[in-house]
Amino acid sequence: MMGRQAVDQSQLFYLFNLEEHIPTDHLLRRINPIVTRVLADLREKLAPFYSDIGRPSIDPELMIRMLIVGYCYGIRFERRLCEEVKLHLGYRWFCRLELEDKVPDHSTFSVNRHGRFRDSDIFRQVFEAVVRACMDAGLVKGEGFAVDASVMEADASRYHGKAPGEIDWSAPERQTRAVAEFLTALDGEDADADRKPPKVISPVDPCSAWTAKANKRVQFGYGLNYLIDIKYAVIVDVEATPARTYDEVAATKTMIQRTQERLGLKPDWLAADTAYGTGKFLHWVIGAGITPHIPVWDMSKREEGILSRADFTFDRERNLYICPQGKFLRTTGTVHDGRTIIYRASTRDCGPCPLKPKCTPNMTFRKIPRDLHEDARDATRALMGTPEFAKSRNERKKVEMRFAHLKTHNGFERMRLRGFSGARDEFHLAAIVQNLKTLANHIWRPLLNTPTACVA
């Protein structure tokens, strides 16, 4: 016989225990003890940024827990997050809210984000506390690191980009936090020979970069930079940059130095893709005592049938190249663009040479550029055929898996906040959640695989 549900929701009193309705293997239950430990000294860290008088504020731990919930489940808009926490029993339990407790208003997050959260750099501190928890659990080996960057689309229309000289930054509609942050950074920026001024800039988020990386459509974006420990793919550092290769390589230096200073971690080797294989960066890596497992960025290959630089022999003692015919290519020692030395052959040698059609068909003499840090490039090339290099190249994919998980499972493909500060906030929260999941899975997997396991 077909049953019928009795619809009567007029009961006034219920015997209800929120704890009993959260499954033992639920994600929030698994990460809860870790978060409790990580946030144990949160109030102490934020105390200098609160007044000693006035009404009590919303508990900062409640706001941090709500943000963790949001980034765990792809709820990055605070207005919707407040609605979901209000309705979801599991979210209420994790945020330590009873059924009758009021959920904070969404505007509370904006006020704290632009104020005490950024002033105290609390997201960075929470992130590092989670990394230390991973280290205590044995998830960080500290021998091999991998680095990579992924483009996150900025909250800026790609159709409204303008040349920098066309924008009036003093206009009333331009008086925003993102623009103020950009202008402040512009005033304090040092001139750099390697950096070219942007051709297109966003009026609403000028800190983002005009990019078409990864074969995507042209857009404004930020670079999400991850430095991971290879063993369990724990994110040991994270940095926000414009979506430009130059800035991403520079961010890697910052992350490695900061990881060593704050966490006491220094890798024996570093894995990365070809974008990081410039002579300048390889020189820095080797100078830091780290073995670079990075393919060398080599643009010396010529058309088929044309002699390339590899066909010439470099004489280190005499500082010159020797061509296949035994002629010399010398240099004046002038450094071009801050990184290249040009070696030139003599017109008298190249003119009657029988190999000229295969060597320099369009010029009267042959010239060869040599990177200022070619020694570092040569040392790295010598590593590229080793078994260790092949193994690290395969393990390097773990950092790409981090980006894939973030975009597919967490729905993180477009920025919600603007400016570098907004990007840093979002990237730190994303890394916090990913590390929490890794740590929770490592701790709970043995318990979940034990039939008699009982978790309180």
For each feature predicted by the language model, list its residue ranges:
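Short, aromatic/basic-rich helix-turn unit that serves as a nucleic-acid recognition element
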Residues: 71
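Short, flexible loop/hinge motifs at secondary-structure junctions
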Residues: 1-15, 166
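Basic, short loop/linker segments at the boundary and entry of helix-turn-helix/winged-helix-like folds
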Residues: 24-68, 372, 376
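Short arginine-rich
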Residues: 92-96
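Anion-binding and metal-coordination hotspots
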Residues: 4-5, 74-87, 97-456
